[in-house]
A protein has these predicted regions:
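Flexible "cap/lid" subdomain of the alpha/beta-hydrolase fold that forms the substrate-access gate
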Residues: 2-19, 25-29, 46, 51, ...
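Short beta-strand element of the alpha/beta-hydrolase
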Residues: 36-43
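Histidine-centered active-site/metal-ligand motif
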Residues: 43, 111, 282
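Typically the conserved alpha-helix immediately C-terminal to a functionally engaged Cys/Sec
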Residues: 54-58
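Active-site machinery of serine-nucleophile hydrolases
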Residues: 60-70
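Hydrophobic pocket-lining residues within nucleotide cofactor-binding pockets
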Residues: 71, 280
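Catalytic histidine-centered segment of alpha/beta-hydrolase-like enzymes
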Residues: 281-293
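C-terminal alpha-helical cap of glycosyltransferases
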Residues: 293-300
Length: 300
């Protein structure tokens, strides 16, 4: 199903909506007109496509086609009872978007936990990838990478009885989410960025976990597979290193978890990459969207 949404000038540009059937529900997609290769924007664990709301107008103003979508189980995409979520499913979601929209070559833009989808898509479908853009994301092992506390809690499956009990108490789970956000915010330097991020991102994450049906099953299933996925991706590092596709690494340097050391490790491993470290936190596309867009649109 496809329809057009028009928004006021200076708000989000006009886009087409798509709902792509994945067998256990449909993916929600927004497609903004422009020249190709299209930027295909992907989100991480606790959020959804809205993390790109401030970035997209700059990319569209630069004349480029932009596609943003919610992985199954998150945001506006379906969250069917009994649905199974995995990193392989997210990679397939990306492939389904490319096929449904008839895109030839794309620029996967990966943030946070969508790093595996973006990088593995480049490995598996290099003929469809013009370049790759990585924003404070993870893939395999990296010497300085740290796991956020709430992610580590749910990733340790031997703590399942504890995390299941936590989920039975909305107040305690909300406290855990707010604690994690505070850990990201305390490493940021710019007070205006801190305030804006808290006001912008807080409702996005809250809606993901409080509006029914919620993203909680997808979050729980994805985090429980994290360590196995890191192991699988570490084995694929030689395939990543062999890619001759250009990579842009755009990194907020105030991220205590997926820190600049992670970006430097990517840069050292990749055959064809540029590294851009910016004064921002983990969600740099929210903190400094104009600067991020300028690098994405550049010919470097």
């Amino acid at each position: 199903m496809t329809n057009t949404i028009n928004k006021p000038f200076n708000a989000t540009p006009a886009y087409l909506e798509h709902h792509i059937d994945r067998g256990q529900g449909s993916i929600y997609v927004r497609d903004y007109e422009g020249s190709e290769p299209a930027f295909v924007l992907m989100h991480g664990f606790p959020d959804n496509l809205h993390i790109y709301d401030d970035l997209i107008p700059h990319l569209v103003a630069g004349g480029r086609r932009v596609v943003a979508f919610d992985f199954l189980g998150f945001g506006y995409s379906d969250k069917q009872t009994g649905a199974r979520y995995s990193y392989e499913q997210q990679l397939s979601d990306l492939h389904a978007v490319v096929e449904h929209l008839g895109l030839d070559k794309i620029v996967p833009v990966a943030h946070d936990a969508s790093g595996p989808a973006g990088i593995n898509y480049a490995i598996d479908y290099p003929e469809h990838v013009a370049s790759v853009c990585l924003l404070n994301c993870a893939y395999g092992v990296a010497p300085t990478k740290k796991t956020p506390e709430i992610i580590g809690l749910f990733a340790h499956t031997d703590l399942k009885s504890y995390t299941q009990a936590l989920l039975q108490s909305p107040e305690q789970f909300e406290w855990a989410l707010k604690f994690q956000m505070s850990k990201f915010l305390e490493h940021m330097k710019d007070d205006s960025q801190i305030q804006y991020l808290a006001n912008f991102l807080g409702p996005i994450i809250e809606t993901n976990f409080t509006k029914h049906p919620t993203s909680t099953p997808a979050f729980v299933q994805m985090t429980s597979q994290l360590f196995e996925e890191v192991t699988r991706n570490t084995k694929r590092l030689p395939e990543m290193e062999a890619l001759d596709i250009p990579f842009k690494l755009i990194w907020g340097d105030h991220d205590p978890y997926l820190n600049t050391g992670v970006a430097e490790d990517f840069h050292a491993r990749l055959k064809n990459s540029s590294l851009h470290v910016l004064p921002a936190g983990h969600w740099l596309q929210i903190d400094i969207p104009e600067q991020v867009a300028a690098i994405m649109l550049s010919n470097e």
